[in-house]
Amino acid sequence: MLDVKVLRQDLEEVKRRLAHRNEDISALDQFVEVDEKRREVIQEAEALKNKRNTVSEQVAVMKRNKENADHLIAEMKEVNERIKALDEELRQLDEQLEFILLSLPNLPHESTPIGTTEDDNVIAWTWGEPRAFDFEIKPHWELASQAGILDFETAAKVTGSRFVFYKGLGARLERALMNFMMDLHSNEHGYEEVIPPFIVNRTSMTGTGQLPKFEEDAFKIEGPDYFLIPTAEVPVTNMHRDEIMDGADLPRYYTAFSACFRSEAGSAGRDTRGLIRQHQFNKVELVKFVKPEESYDELDKLVKNAEKVLQLLGLPYRVLSMCTGDLGFTAAKKFDIEVWIPSGDTYREISSCSNFEDFQARRANIRFRRDTKSKPEFVHTLNGSGLAIGRTVAAILENYQEADGAIVIPEVLRPYMGGVDKIAPK
């Protein structure tokens, strides 16, 4: 949520920065209209309440003097009815104002490249060289089928499209990656390990920015107002909702394993095969709560933490600085990490690392005090994938494939695989 004071005091600057997102910003004009009406209602209500107080004193004096005050009492009855109506109008205007504020995206940071589509994203750097194969490259779903480690057909029968059964060494590889990532982030990068609920309430989804704008993308549970989480960012960030944190405890780092659930609305016909775009997938998430002046240094560290996973796995990747038109609703600055997928001769996203500044903190009311005498301030929140496990499996299968269809297990994972160094086709 944007700072209301900034909207009121520097609206043109807000319009300028939001215009770079290539989105409809007419809600800003609605904000001005509703905010002005709200101020008028407050002024009228306060004037009437002051009048009521004054007249009440007059009525008391007249009654003590045994004078007739019926005309003033009748007038005050009308005033009270008007105040009641104004209070209800103010409540409705506050609801409208909150809805408008919740619908406005974050302001892009000045260092975010200006652009309209993914074609305007800037390659910041690359790591590793894509392997030169001397045989025909197979996509990961073919390799997995030959090895009997992924079963999309049975998952389609049991549930539907965009689901998968991991079997045998495939299930072990998924679990090995989860343990490897969690160990790396908790033991070497200083994150506290968390396994959160996979179901959250509406307030939590609103706090991190998924609602109200993207409700159609979420899996809603019938009955109670619950949602399956699209990412562990939602429950982990909301751990500190409505809290005032101790500044001495910042920064706070959390790493969380969870299943993630995405409806993939608008993705019909895209990535219909394999692990790249699933309705359910596992992910290790990185979440930070930091002081405002430290958040961009912390973003750099966050990206490096996610990169380290790919470096240890020996998977080539590149890092993109996302442009204003491809930034996402909540981020002020975002880097995407894309891993090399040989069968597509392309890089595919495997992590997004974002600085939300105080955007989520305002929505979720997450604050901190620098010391006991200081006023509470909003924290800055950050999050990134560390990594999406299914896409990491796909990248390993394709980058480590051999001519006979076998898949070599990256050396760093072998202790987590019980010493298994290769998955052979059946």
UniProtKB/Swiss-Prot annotation:
Name of the molecule in the record: Serine--tRNA ligase
Pathway connected to this protein: Aminoacyl-tRNA biosynthesis; selenocysteinyl-tRNA(Sec) biosynthesis; L-seryl-tRNA(Sec) from L-serine and tRNA(Sec): step 1/1
Family statement: Belongs to the class-II aminoacyl-tRNA synthetase family. Type-1 seryl-tRNA synthetase subfamily.
Keyword Transferase part of the UniProt annotation: no
Tagged with keyword Manganese: no
Entry-linked InterPro entries: aa-tRNA-synt_IIb, aa-tRNA-synth_II, aa-tRNA-synth_II/BPL/LPL, Ser-tRNA-ligase_type_1, Ser-tRNA-synth_1_N, SerRS_1_N_sf, SerRS_core, tRNA-bd_arm
Catalytic activity: tRNA(Ser) + L-serine + ATP = L-seryl-tRNA(Ser) + AMP + diphosphate + H(+); tRNA(Sec) + L-serine + ATP = L-seryl-tRNA(Sec) + AMP + diphosphate + H(+)
Domain note: Consists of two distinct domains, a catalytic core and a N-terminal extension that is involved in tRNA binding.
GO CC terms, sorted: cytoplasm
EC class name: ligase
Binding annotation for ATP: 262-264, 349-352
Localization terms from the record: Cytoplasm
Signal peptide range in chain numbering: none
PANTHER family registered for this protein in UniProt: SERINE--TRNA LIGASE, SERYL-TRNA SYNTHETASE
EC number: 6.1.1.11
Stated role: Catalyzes the attachment of serine to tRNA(Ser). Is also able to aminoacylate tRNA(Sec) with serine, to form the misacylated tRNA L-seryl-tRNA(Sec), which will be further converted into selenocysteinyl-tRNA(Sec).
GO biological process: selenocysteine biosynthetic process; seryl-tRNA aminoacylation
Encoding gene per record: serS
Subunit structure of this chain's protein: Homodimer. The tRNA molecule binds across the dimer.
Major location (coarse): cytoplasm
Superkingdom of origin organism: Bacteria
Binding locations of L-serine: 231-233, 285, 385
GO molecular function: ATP binding; catalytic activity, acting on a protein; serine-tRNA ligase activity; transferase activity
